[in-house]
Design a protein with these regions (language model features):
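Gly/Ser/Thr-enriched, mixed-charge loops and adjacent short helices
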Residues: 12, 16, 20, 36-45, ...
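Conserved phosphate/anionic-ligand binding catalytic regions in large, soluble enzymes, centered on
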Residues: 41-61, 145-147, 230-238, 242, ...
Length: 449
């Protein structure tokens, strides 16, 4: 191990506010474990429009308290230059999420920022809702969404107008990410950052407001038998509250996946798009003769649906198929309403919008761009992201998508039809739109460049 690298590690250890990660680095240093140290010091974890996301491990290349503190301090500097004064922080139930939320809250409150913290692990859409509903300038969500269990992340939402961009409780876009990244790079000592415990816990009334608003999407509850899985994430509590408020009582939980578990023990990857991820839910649906399977990813901002297809048996609807279903039935709130999807999605929603005389816009990849469309009525991306109620959550929301598809299936059943029948009607008008996802997983971005 060369002396320059060894000194870099020693300096980080001295500045690490977390005794546990500092001790781990010191142990690797003492045992001359350069392999692990190089993994932890492979450059700084890069901050971008998706915030931070990476493996939970010591050093500048991982998600840990030191990196979270440094990032929070950079956001504080950005906020002060922009005249922003308040933040709300949420978290999922992944490894390190609670510690990272507390560290972030300590940095923000120590800098004099009004800091609110959601009471317990909750879906990402609740944080997006709270950012707007509480009138906060910034929202922070500690989550890695549907990443593998060893990962965690740090997402940033904005509540107002920055650089002429109206955020309204949506994720940051360029150039805001670069402005924040520049401030993060200017943070020197991590250990000497002022920390305080002056944050406030947000009362659960904010959850009740979200539940009430979202439940209004379903005005005619039925008796469909629906299987639900939270994929070991944080969706169960909130989704059950929404369905109960809306009058849907016949939910069958996948008990083995209903409660938060950061190890995601029953799935290879906690992503409903992954082959096999919904097998357990589909097996329960088959045995119970259910009408529908609904799945959220671990932070419940995405929604997957499986149906019993007479031709092939139970299958998962592709994201574009579900997008077409929503676009066909979602009401046009006004002549100003706009449908939108990203360039990686099908062209079917554009055709449906044209037939319904609804304005349509196509955006760059990522829901952060869809959320910036003014007068958005419905937005989606093929990766199971749907915004069916932008007035409540101006971002993808797996809970609202779930209750809405339950209502759609109920209404169709009342007419003696199914979701497949509706899709057939759509294809008969616009032509069949085939779609298939191909996923290639790599450890480093350089492998695909």
């Amino acid at each position: 191990m060369d002396q320059h690298f060894s000194q870099e590690v020693k300096e980080w250890i001295l500045d690490d506010p977390d005794a546990l990660t500092a001790a781990q680095l010191q142990s690797w240093l003492d045992s001359d474990n350069e392999i692990e140290l190089r993994k932890s010091f492979n450059g700084f974890l890069q901050f971008g429009t998706a915030g931070l996301r990476g493996p939970v491990r010591p050093g500048p290349s991982g998600m840990n308290r030191a990196v979270v503190a440094r990032t929070s301090a950079g956001i504080v500097a950005f906020m002060k230059k922009q005249g922003l004064t308040s933040v709300v922080i949420g978290r999922d139930a992944r490894h390190g999420s609670k510690e990272f939320a507390v560290e972030s809250a300590a940095i923000f409150s120590g800098a004099g920022i009004k800091t609110l913290v959601l009471s317990h692990p909750l879906p990402t859409p609740v944080l997006a809702f709270a950012t707007n509903e509480l009138g906060c300038d910034v929202g922070i969500m500690i989550t890695a969404s549907h990443n593998p269990p060893q990962d965690n992340g740090f997402k940033v939402y904005l509540g107002g107008v920055i650089d002429s961009i109206s955020y309204r409780g949506s994720q940051i876009t360029s150039p805001t990410d670069s402005l924040i990244a520049d401030e993060i790079l200017r943070v020197n000592s991590i250990k000497s950052l002022v920390r305080a415990d002056k944050w406030s816990i947000v009362e659960d009334q904010i959850i009740e407001k979200y539940v009430t608003r979202t439940a209004r999407l379903a005005m005619n509850p039925g008796k469909l038998k629906i299987v639900y899985t939270a994929m070991h994430g944080v969706g169960t509590e909130t989704l059950l509250a929404v369905f109960k408020k809306a009058g849907f009582d016949a939910l069958i939980l996948v008990d083995a996946q209903a409660q938060p578990d950061p190890d995601f023990p029953t799935v290879a990857f906690p992503n409903p798009e992954e082959p096999g991820a919904m097998d357990l839910a589909i097996e329960i649906a088959r045995k119970s003769h259910a009408d529908l399977v609904i799945a959220n990813d671990p932070d419940a901002d995405r929604c997957a649906v499986a149906i019993d297809d007479p031709l092939v048996g139970w299958r998962i609807l592709r994201g574009d198929e579900l997008g077409a279903v929503f676009a066909q039935v979602i009401p046009q709130n006004s002549s100003l309403g706009v449908f939108a999807n990203s360039i990686v999605s099908s062209t079917i929603v554009k055709k449906i919008a044209e037939q319904r005389s609804i304005k349509f816009e196509e955006t760059l990849t990522g829901f952060k761009w869809i959320s910036k469309i003014q007068n958005l009525s419905f937005g989606y991306e093929e990766a199971l992201g749907y915004c069916v109620d932008p007035e409540t959550v101006n971002d993808k929301d797996g809970i609202s998508a779930a209750i809405y598809i339950a209502q759609i299936a109920t209404d169709l059943a009342g007419d003696g039809k199914t979701i497949l029948d509706l899709l057939d009607e759509i294809w008969s008008v616009h032509g069949y739109h085939a779609t298939e996802q191909i996923s290639i997983r790599v450890e480093e971005i350089s492998q695909v460049m």
